[in-house]
Amino acid sequence: MFYGFDIGGSKIALGVYNAHRQLIWQRRVATPKDDYAQLLAAIDTLTQQADGFCGVRGSVGIGVPGLPIADDGTIFSANIPAARGRTLRADLSARLGREVRIDNDANCFALSEAWDDEFMQYPVVLGMILGTGVGGGLIVDGKPVTGRNYVVGELGHMRLPVDALRVLGRDIPLLPCGCGKYGCIEGYLSGNGFSWLWHYFYQKTHSAPEIIRRYYEGDTDALAHTERYRELLAVCLGNILTLLDPHLVVLGGGLSNFDALYDGLSERVSSHLLPVARPPRFERARHGDAGGMRGAAFLHLKF
């Protein structure tokens, strides 16, 4: 059995999956805010409950917001104060008496999609999140690629490509990013970026859902705005795909539900790739809110 924990700022969700990758049991509890001992105890209790339900000791995988440090599993996450700076992986492995694997929630999202029954045919899968921020994960042969510093897939912190100036204009401000740099694509491609660009070009203040509603109502500014955003997405994907060359790109996050983004996306991207390169398949994420715990559980699967 495979146990997947999705630990967020407000809740801990546990899903138990069988050998066929089917969800057979789940629980949810509140995340202890500032008490590390309570956090360990909550995970321990849920694990024991799952063991009791299954009649066997399952494997444990955990997805967290933030970046686990590759060397020792120390957690750096603003959303889980109780775990910040703690060696969660080592402490839980000792407490539970089994190997615990931890990865960030974006990698777990990508892993969940890569293990979809249909998507398993693709050796290299890129999960890209277009939500409050921009992030993602790279899956190769059923395993997340993490790199030296666990920053593989931090797509939002790539800088605007030169071709973006053609789309947005040479006077576009290089927005400051929370990472301390300027001009990161997250500032323009995220849901907040979608709204910021709307305000920048049209001096109107609306949320992304409101702009999308206007698009479907035929608002001319919303139509033009969506066209500009689609071209910007294609430009940014051109750099990412040239570097990673995935077979499949799965889009998640709130903006991934905007059907218009997929219109002609392959053709748009093709013009930003090498002449010999074919675009990957683009799909919307299929596993929704369950992706975090599902992907965490699958950290123990073998391709």
UniProtKB/Swiss-Prot annotation:
GO terms for biological process: N-acetylglucosamine metabolic process; peptidoglycan turnover. ATP binds at residues 4-11, 133-140. InterPro entries: ATPase_NBD (IPR043129), N-acetyl-D-glucosamine_kinase (IPR023505), ROK (IPR000600), ROK_cs (IPR049874). PROSITE patterns: ROK. Keywords: ATP-binding, Carbohydrate metabolism, Kinase, Metal-binding, Nucleotide-binding, Transferase, Zinc. Its EC number is 2.7.1.59. Pathway: Cell wall biogenesis; peptidoglycan recycling. Zn(2+) binds at H157, C177, C179, C184. It catalyses: N-acetyl-D-glucosamine + ATP = N-acetyl-D-glucosamine 6-phosphate + ADP + H(+). Belongs to the ROK (NagC/XylR) family. NagK subfamily. PANTHER family: N-ACETYL-D-GLUCOSAMINE KINASE, ROK (REPRESSOR, ORF, KINASE) FAMILY. This is N-acetyl-D-glucosamine kinase. It comes from Erwinia tasmaniensis (strain DSM 17950 / CFBP 7177 / CIP 109463 / NCPPB 4357 / Et1/99). The gene is nagK.
